[in-house]
């Protein structure tokens, strides 16, 4: 594919989109999602891996809570990947990731993912480009492995916010008592590296697109949630699942 230029992609909903109408539609979509997730769990022939990437304050946590929070917790798993531990660093970079690959019947959500190992690591020059491109090839092979050998369907979302909106949200973490627990002064340091992160994300989109990325405008939470929920709903509907019948002895 041609190289994606994030600076040329809008971070907001099209002007003609109505906020309240979209929220009303989302209620219906979430009801469909609930039924489809139950069907996925009952049939247990497929699994779904949802990868969520984005800059700090892009709304990853809120998206997971508002779109997936009302689904049956028996069939939905969420893993947030932080900085690797000493044990994890002693293995290949995908070791800790593969441990959370979804079993058939499950939806697995990655809050950050294997892509951190070719993003922040490059921005801070912890790895060189040669290592990064080898890792990208490994990621492509790993995603193909899940698709081909476990009927895992993969959706990859990049939550696309503007630097101004990021700054507003980071500032709110200082001012709002309900959000102060999220505050981390390092987030401001990382925000200063915005252009470097955009460059690395764009390179990642180009070289890790065998499973395509969805670039989701994320300045407005209502629109972001609608786009992600709709994409997940459509993916599950496309599996043409059926409830199993009575088991014969």
Model-assigned labels for residue ranges:
Residues 32-41:
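Pre-Walker A adenine-sensing motif
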Residues 50-53, 152-165, 184-189, 207-227:
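Phosphate-binding beta-loop-alpha motif at adenosine-nucleotide cofactor sites
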């Amino acid at each position: 594919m041609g190289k994606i230029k994030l600076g040329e992609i809008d971070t907001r909903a099209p002007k003609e989109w109505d906020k309240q109408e979209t929220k009303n539609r989302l209620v219906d979509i979430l009801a469909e999602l609930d039924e489809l997730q139950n069907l996925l769990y009952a049939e247990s022939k497929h699994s779904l891996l949802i990868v969520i990437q984005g800059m700090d304050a892009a709304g990853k946590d809120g998206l997971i809570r508002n779109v997936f929070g009302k689904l049956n917790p028996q069939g939905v798993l969420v893993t947030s990947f932080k900085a690797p531990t000493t044990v994890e660093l002693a293995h290949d970079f995908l070791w800790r990731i593969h441990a959370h690959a979804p079993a058939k019947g499950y939806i697995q959500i990655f809050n950050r993912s294997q892509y951190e190992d070719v993003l922040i690591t490059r921005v801070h020059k912890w790895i060189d480009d040669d290592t990064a491109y080898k890792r990208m090839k490994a990621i492509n092979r790993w995603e193909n492995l899940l698709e081909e050998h476990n009927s895992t369907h993969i959706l990859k979302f990049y939550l696309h916010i503007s630097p101004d909106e990021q700054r507003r949200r980071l500032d709110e973490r200082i001012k709002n008592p309900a959000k102060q627990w999220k505050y981390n002064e390092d987030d401001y340091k990382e925000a200063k590296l915005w252009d470097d992160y955009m460059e690395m994300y764009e390179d990642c989109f180009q070289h890790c697109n065998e499973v395509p990325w969805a670039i989701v405008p994320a300045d407005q939470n209502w629109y972001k949630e609608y786009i992600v929920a709709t994409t997940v709903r459509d993916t599950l509907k496309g599996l043409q699942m059926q409830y199993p019948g009575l088991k014969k002895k």
